Amino acid sequence: VVAPPYDVIPDAALPTYEALSPYNVVRLTRPGRDYDGAARTFNDWLDRGILEPDPPSMYVHEVRFDGKRRRDLIAALRLQPYDDRVVLPHERTHRGPKEDRLALLRATNVSLEPLWFVYEGRATGLQQIVEVVSRRNPAVTFNGPEGTEHRLWVISDPALHAAVHAALETQSVLIADGHHRYETALAHADEVGGDPDSASRFTLALLTDLEDPGLEVLPTHRVLKAGVAVTGGEEKQSLDETLEAIRGRVAAGTYRDHRFQVLPLEGELAVVELHRQVIDNILGKRSPEDFLLYTRDPAEAVRWVDDGVGSAAFFLDAPDLHVVLKQAQEGKTLPQKSTYFHPKPPSGMVFFRLDPNRSL
């Protein structure tokens, strides 16, 4: 019944998820333009007991993947404008995806997918709460996308709720995944209204400690469609040698005319400096979004250049999350697709109804 977040499911894969179960979450998160139909489906599942309301609860979520483990907290997070510097964005957004998600929110009044946030948890004591809860038997276990294994624990003890609140009340959080959905949730909350503590002023959130050893961020490589000459780099013999040479450095690999190079960059974050020092100079006033292709597979980037889809590929190492957080705290936004947090939390575990008449 679970599925990846709505924006990482290709249209061609929708029938596959729909065929898994008549109750797969894509029937809610990817209804096409039938937003009212998604609302009817959600209410029908409630009426038939397919979905069961919990008492006020938080949840601990664990995902195992590739021999690693990550633990998260799922809870309602108060929506606050970026200017309050509590919720920190690190990427710009586009209008189109927000219009689609806002229409779905208006129809359903339900937070259907958790937004993913990262927090600095070393001094909060929250991770200790998560560890204690996860020693119990989980309420739910299931297999998720990409071979992931998941466990879910329910926290219904008001004393633990208070402890979690105390641990996080002075913390800022970084949006890991869901910039468009967060801004949509803000717009919806303003439309619906309600007092400051009403459910409509919150969103469903999955929160991960920045120091969790299972928190993984992957690089996204770029292929430039415009004609470009890249010079001055260190020559490399292969893709593997290029990727190894940029690991842990503020540098970018390049591929053009069957030649690999490494470009040293000056600054804190390679993806920022690649755009500022190289790509922006090539494109001038032209929008990068019109001239860039993105992939997490460096070999695919090489194929695109060899096939003439693009003229040059740029390879990046995974960004340092501490630097990403620092730049977000300074109010700086990064280029599009600077981070790819992995594996993304599946949709369909927990839903949160945005009732303006219900106080939290």
Descriptions of predicted regions:
Residues 1-360:
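Surface-exposed, charge/polar-rich loops and edge strands
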